[in-house]
C-alpha cells in the first residue's frame, strides 16, 4: 500500500504498461493503480476513485455487494451484525450489532431481550439478579440476590442453603436466612 500516494502513469504490471486505473488481478473489480513506475520492484499501489454505481464491498468469503446493500455477518466474537456496504473508495462496511438494532443485551455470550431477567455469578462468587434494559447500547444492570456469606470462609450461600461448619472443634449446622441483610444462623450438632 502507498499510504494515499497518487497514481503514477504509466505503471508496469504483468509486463504491460497501464496508463489508467485497472481492476486487472482483482476478483472484486476494485480499480487500482501503481504509485511508482514499477509495481513489481516497489510493491506500491493504491485504489482509484470509483463512481458510486461501480463501487463494491467484499465479504471475507469473497462475495461482492454493491454500495447500499445490507447483509448479515457474524462478528469474530460470535454475535451477529447487520452490515451496509458504504464503499468510500475502499470497499468499506458499516456494521451494527443486532443487540443495538433489536435493543438486546449480550452477556457472557448469551443474548437477552429488553426486560428479560437472568441470574449471573459475580466474579467474587455471589449471585446477582440482572435485567436487560437495552437502550440502544445493550445496557444491563444487576443487583445482588438476597444471600448470606460465611464471615470466615467468605463462601456465599443462597436463601435456604445449609452447610456444616466447625468452630473450636464443635460441629455446627448453619442455615442461610437472608432477610435482606445476609442473616444466617448455626446450631450445634450432637
Curated annotation (Swiss-Prot):
Glycans are attached at residues 17, 115, 129. One of its GO terms (molecular function) is heparin binding. Signal peptide: none annotated. Disulfide bonds join 7-33, 21-48, 57-85, 83-95, 105-132, 130-142, 174-186. The keyword Secreted does not apply. Keywords: Acute phase, Cell adhesion, Cell shape, Disulfide bond, Glycoprotein, Heparin-binding, Repeat. GO terms for biological process: acute-phase response; cell adhesion; regulation of cell shape. Residues 1-50 form the Fibronectin type-II domain. Forms covalent cross-links mediated by a transglutaminase, such as F13A or TGM2, between a glutamine and the epsilon-amino group of a lysine residue, forming homopolymers and heteropolymers (e.g. fibrinogen-fibronectin, collagen-fibronectin heteropolymers). The keyword Glycoprotein applies. One of its GO terms (cellular component) is extracellular region. It comes from the Eukaryota. Residues 55-98, 103-145, 146-190 form the Fibronectin type-I domain. Dimers or multimers of alternatively spliced variants, connected by 2 disulfide bonds near the carboxyl ends. Fibronectins bind cell surfaces and various compounds including collagen, fibrin, heparin, DNA, and actin. Fibronectins are involved in cell adhesion, cell motility, opsonization, wound healing, and maintenance of cell shape. May be involved in osteoblast compaction. Beneath wound epithelium, fibronectin probably provides a substrate on which the dedifferentiation stump tissue cells will migrate and accumulate. This is Fibronectin. It comes from Notophthalmus viridescens (Eastern newt).
Amino acid at each position: 500500500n502507498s499510504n494515499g500516494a497518487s497514481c503514477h502513469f504509466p505503471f508496469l504490471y504483468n509486463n504491460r504498461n497501464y496508463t489508467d486505473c485497472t481492476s486487472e488481478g482483482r476478483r472484486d473489480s476494485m480499480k487500482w493503480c501503481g504509485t511508482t513506475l514499477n509495481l513489481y520492484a516497489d510493491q506500491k499501489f493504491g485504489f482509484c476513485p470509483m463512481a458510486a454505481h461501480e463501487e463494491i464491498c467484499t465479504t471475507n468469503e469473497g462475495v461482492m455487494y454493491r454500495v447500499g446493500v445490507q447483509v448479515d455477518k457474524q462478528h469474530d466474537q460470535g454475535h451477529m451484525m447487520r452490515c451496509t456496504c458504504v464503499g468510500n473508495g475502499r470497499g468499506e462496511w458499516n456494521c451494527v450489532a443486532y443487540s443495538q438494532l433489536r435493543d438486546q443485551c449480550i452477556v457472557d455470550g448469551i443474548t437477552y431481550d429488553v426486560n428479560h431477567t437472568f441470574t449471573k455469578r459475580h466474579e467474587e462468587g455471589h449471585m446477582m439478579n440482572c435485567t436487560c434494559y437495552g437502550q440502544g447500547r445493550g445496557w444491563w444492570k444487576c443487583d445482588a440476590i438476597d444471600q448470606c456469606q460465611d464471615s470466615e470462609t467468605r463462601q456465599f450461600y443462597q436463601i435456604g442453603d445449609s452447610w456444616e461448619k466447625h468452630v473450636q472443634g464443635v460441629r455446627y449446622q448453619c442455615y442461610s436466612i437472608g432477610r435482606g441483610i445476609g442473616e444466617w444462623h448455626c446450631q450445634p450438632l450432637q
